[in-house]
C-alpha cells in the first residue's frame, strides 16, 4: 500500500511505509544547509567514505577541473580537443552538475558554480534551444539545486526559464 511521508516540506509516496498519512516519521525536515554553514545534505565526512566512493569523487573532481579549465560556463567541453561547445549558451553542464557537486560534498566547486548562476546565467537571449535537453538539464538542474538547498536563487532562475519554455 502507498502512504505519504514528508520530505523537505513536501509529500512523497512511499511504498514501504503503511502509516496511511499519519505523518510522524519525517524523513528529512531540513531546509537546506545548516545555520552554522555546514552542508547538511552530505552527512558523511571523507574519512567515512569507502575507497570506491573516494575514487568516484576523485574522478568527478578530475572532470570538473577539466570543465573549469576548458569550458567553465559553457554548455559542454570537448575533452579530446580541449575546447568547448556552446549549444544554447546557458551553461548546461554547470547547471546540470549542481546537485552532483552538492551530494559529493564538493562544496568549493558548488560555490563557484552557484556564483556563476547568480552573476552570469541569463535567459534573456534570442536562441533556439532543444526543449527536451533544456528542460531536463537546465530546468531540472535548477530545481534539483533548489530542492537540496532551498536557495531562492535557483527557484527564481527556474521560474524564469520555465515561463520562457512554456509557449513551446
Language model segments and positions:
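Glycan-recognition and catalytic cores of secretory/periplasmic carbohydrate-active enzymes
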Residues: 1-17, 22-168
Amino acid at each position: 500500500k502507498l502512504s505519504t511521508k514528508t520530505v523537505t516540506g513536501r509529500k512523497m509516496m512511499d511504498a514501504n511505509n503503511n502509516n496511511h498519512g499519519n505523518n510522524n516519521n519525517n524523513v528529512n525536515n531540513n531546509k537546506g544547509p545548516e545555520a552554522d554553514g555546514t552542508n547538511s545534505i552530505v552527512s558523511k565526512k571523507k574519512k567515512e567514505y569507502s575507497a570506491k566512493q573516494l575514487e568516484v569523487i576523485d574522478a568527478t573532481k578530475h572532470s570538473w577541473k577539466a570543465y573549469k579549465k576548458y569550458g567553465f560556463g559553457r554548455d559542454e567541453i570537448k575533452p579530446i580537443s580541449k575546447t568547448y561547445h556552446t549549444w544554447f549558451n546557458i551553461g548546461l553542464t554547470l547547471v546540470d552538475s549542481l546537485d552532483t557537486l552538492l551530494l559529493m560534498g564538493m562544496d568549493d566547486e558548488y560555490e563557484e558554480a552557484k556564483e556563476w548562476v547568480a552573476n552570469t546565467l541569463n535567459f534573456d537571449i534570442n536562441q533556439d534551444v532543444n526543449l527536451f535537453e533544456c528542460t531536463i538539464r537546465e530546468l531540472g538542474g535548477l530545481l534539483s539545486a533548489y530542492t537540496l538547498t532551498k536557495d531562492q536563487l535557483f527557484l527564481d532562475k527556474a521560474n524564469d526559464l520555465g515561463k520562457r519554455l512554456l509557449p513551446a
